[in-house]
Amino acid sequence: MMGKYLWALVYVTVMILIIVVEVESSLHRVGGGRYTWNSDVNFSDWANHQRFYSGDWLYFGFNRTRHNILQVNKSSYEQCVDNDYIFNITRGGRDVFQLLEPKPYYFICGRGYCLKGMKLAITVLPQPPPSAPTNFTSTTTPLIPPNAITAAILIFAFKALLL
């Protein structure tokens, strides 16, 4: 019996999160693919075709026995200095890094690979303001108003709690 209540509570929580929470961040696969943190990718070209916002995530896929990912300052990035890094992102070869602030970020691969072009510089922008809702002038009304759908979901979840 208690299991039913637990599932109902989980269901209600998930529904509320889906309704209320709006995810604004994106995942960027560095280099454009699954395992593209390697010396065959032009990271400057890739970054120039991306737009990064605070809250976004970078995904680095690579062979961890050969490569690593170090967050560095601009000077270390330009000179490929890997012993004065800010943060070592390397964990398991499929690693993520969240871009928390709007600012420039610099990443390099140590072990001599930075000199072969394995480095990435990006500029992170502040989150854009939410877009204004589009004002549609329609003569028809939806069959089910959005608030009715939300109410139906919550009523169903509440009834499930009572069962």
UniProtKB/Swiss-Prot annotation:
Annotated S-S bridges: 80-114
Function: May act as a carbohydrate transporter.
Signal peptide interval: 1-25
Membrane topology summary: Lipid-anchor; GPI-anchor
CDD domains: Phytocyanin_like_1
Protein name: Early nodulin-like protein 20
GO CC annotation terms, alphabetical: plasma membrane; side of membrane
Keyword terms, alphabetized: Cell membrane, Disulfide bond, Glycoprotein, GPI-anchor, Lipoprotein, Membrane, Signal
Family: Belongs to the early nodulin-like (ENODL) family.
Residues lipid-modified (GPI-anchor amidated serine): 138
Sites where a glycan is attached: 42, 63, 73, 88, 135
Domain Phytocyanin stretches: 26-126
Localisation per UniProt entry: Cell membrane
GO MF terms, alphabetically ordered: electron transfer activity
Pfam assignment, any one: Cu_bind_like
Propeptide residue interval(s): 139-163
